[in-house]
């Protein structure tokens, strides 16, 4: 049975004209049926007053489709994007983040890069650097199984995209655009590449990603630049298309060449093209292995196994976790880690007080190396995670508390197992379970109970986004995230009147304390936890 295609819409610079955009989308859906996603490139916010945006932000108005947007391209609009890792801006409107890979439940793979090119250091909050592009390429391109991605979203055009192609109109692609984006497109081989900022519509003829007669056939790339919303010249700013994720396609069907396919615009013509020489100097590859945003993990698993087996003289030695090429707030060796919050360090994991915790003893179990989710952990790391969980249960039980453990593998870079103690006097375990199920139903979240002794790896494949909660009885609840998911869901349930009764603490950013107070809490926890510290037994 053929895979049903996804129906997507892509939009150029919105520039704050939200009503015009969403009214147009509604009209299209009324006429042609519903679409699965709306992807926005270019400037989502403009220099117009915020009154129109406030209606969406407060929920007075709602986007009629799940919408994903890129970040700021100038200093003026940085204020709208509070979290560099991505966040929900309004209902049905999500900021993807500075850079990363979004893999939907369908398997569709979208790579995104926010901002404009900058070669300055430090890089402004609205720009990307050669290192950003290098890390994106490193995520995927270093595996032999890599064939390309479904969609690439950037705001700037790629430089030289007009080479060998149809006319790009008034835009001179030899002078306009970003060479870094060209390099990224060369490496990632997207089936579709969308960009904006130039206030015009340009659909380039598809170009090939292989050298004829020298390389095996590969899929073609279609580059589409979109105009700004509501432009007086009526230039096209919305693009509708259907796509089957490449991982689900028959290989022969995927590499079929369109009749109007051209040479790759990022390679020189003639004899130099036949030798595979590129116009662009390659972006320097990071020495680090991989850095995963959102959901992409499959490449890492395959690559790490092969790489370690070749490089290690001792096969039984635990394999090293992938290292992020950029800053990570939770890799213990990273200078970004707030080390005053660390309360215990094991061989493969460590404990840290949660910043803006639900209680003074709300802690996180984190891998020392860079892993994004539990399903990615190696056996030795899983073993120590379980040891920490069991030890914390005993510790909190001695203090008249039961603990709830949850993980949200969505919009996160580094695995964080949240461990929240709940006083036995507050409620029973069944009350906690009922609270999760009730709030999930209210928010139309399908929370399923899974077997007590089941392994999360049996139900969540690498690359899948999910939410998972484990109760002190061993009962487990699981939700496979398909589209959007409330980032604070776990905290909201536990902060509710039915459990901890601290609803004002549902968002960690609203309950931060001073560094001095954090240091005091950390000292107290270390002292109290010391009798249970299994790391002292080694």
From Swiss-Prot:
Gene Ontology molecular-function annotations: RNA lariat debranching enzyme activator activity
A cellular component term, taken from the record's GO annotations: post-mRNA release spliceosomal complex
GO biological process, any: mRNA splicing, via spliceosome
InterPro entries: Cwf19-like (IPR040194), Cwf19-like_C_dom-1 (IPR006768), Cwf19-like_C_dom-2 (IPR006767), HIT-like_sf (IPR036265)
Family: Belongs to the CWF19 family.
Region annotation (Disordered) ranges: 259-278, 298-324
Protein's name according to its UniProt entry: CWF19-like protein 1
């Amino acid at each position: 049975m053929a895979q049903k295609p996804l129906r997507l819409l892509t939009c150029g610079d919105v520039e704050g004209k939200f009503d015009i955009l969403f009214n147009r989308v509604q009209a299209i859906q009324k006429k042609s049926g519903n679409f699965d996603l709306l992807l926005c490139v270019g400037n989502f916010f403009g220099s117009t007053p915020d009154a129109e945006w406030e209606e969406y932000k407060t929920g007075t108005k709602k986007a009629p489709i799940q919408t994903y947007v890129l970040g700021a391209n100038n200093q003026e609009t940085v204020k709208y994007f509070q979290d560099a890792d991505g966040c929900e801006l309004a209902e049905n409107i999500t900021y993807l983040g500075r850079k990363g890979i979004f893999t939907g439940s369908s398997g569709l793979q979208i790579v995104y890069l926010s901002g404009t090119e900058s070669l300055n250091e430090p890089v402004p909050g609205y720009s990307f650097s050669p290192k950003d592009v290098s890390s994106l390429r490193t995520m995927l391109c270093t595996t032999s199984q890599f064939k390309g991605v479904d969609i690439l979203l950037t705001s700037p055009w790629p430089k030289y995209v007009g080479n060998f192609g149809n006319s790009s109109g008034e835009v001179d692609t030899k002078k306009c655009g970003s060479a870094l984006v060209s390099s990224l497109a060369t490496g990632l081989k997207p089936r579709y590449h969308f960009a904006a900022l130039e206030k015009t519509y340009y659909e380039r003829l598809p170009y090939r990603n292989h050298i004829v007669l020298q390389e095996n056939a590969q899929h073609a790339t279609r580059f589409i630049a979109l105009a700004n919303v509501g432009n007086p010249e009526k230039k096209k700013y919305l693009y509708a298309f259907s796509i089957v994720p490449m991982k689900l396609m028959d290989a022969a069907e995927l590499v079929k060449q369109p009749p109007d396919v051209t040479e790759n615009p990022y390679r020189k013509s003639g004899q130099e093209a036949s030798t595979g020489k590129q116009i662009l100097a390659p972006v320097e590859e990071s020495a680090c292995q991989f850095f995963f945003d959102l959901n992409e993990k499959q490449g890492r698993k395959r690559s790490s196994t092969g790489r370690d087996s070749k490089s290690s003289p001792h096969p039984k030695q635990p394999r090293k976790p992938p290292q992020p090429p950029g800053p990570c707030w939770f890799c213990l060796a990273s200078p970004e880690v707030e080390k005053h919050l660390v309360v215990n360090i094991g061989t493969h994991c460590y404990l840290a007080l949660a910043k803006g915790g639900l209680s003074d003893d709300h802690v996180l179990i984190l891998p020392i190396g860079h892993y994004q989710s539990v399903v990615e952990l190696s056996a030795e790391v899983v073993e120590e995670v379980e040891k920490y969980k069991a030890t914390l249960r005993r510790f909190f039980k001695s203090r008249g508390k039961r603990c709830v453990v949850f993980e949200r593998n969505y919009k996160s870079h580094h695995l964080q197992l949240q461990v929240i103690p709940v006083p036995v006097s507050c409620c029973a375990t069944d009350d906690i379970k009922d609270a999760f199920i009730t709030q999930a139903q209210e928010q139309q979240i399908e929370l399923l109970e899974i077997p007590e002794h089941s392994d999360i790896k049996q139900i969540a494949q690498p690359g899948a986004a999910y939410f998972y909660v484990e109760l002190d009885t061993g009962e487990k609840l699981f939700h496979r995230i398909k589209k959007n998911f409330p980032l604070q869901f776990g905290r909201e349930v536990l902060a509710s009147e039915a459990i901890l009764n601290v609803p004002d603490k549902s968002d960690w950013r609203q309950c931060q304390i001073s560094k001095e107070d954090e240091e005091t809490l950390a000292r107290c926890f270390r002292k109290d936890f010391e009798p249970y510290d299994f790391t002292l037994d080694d």
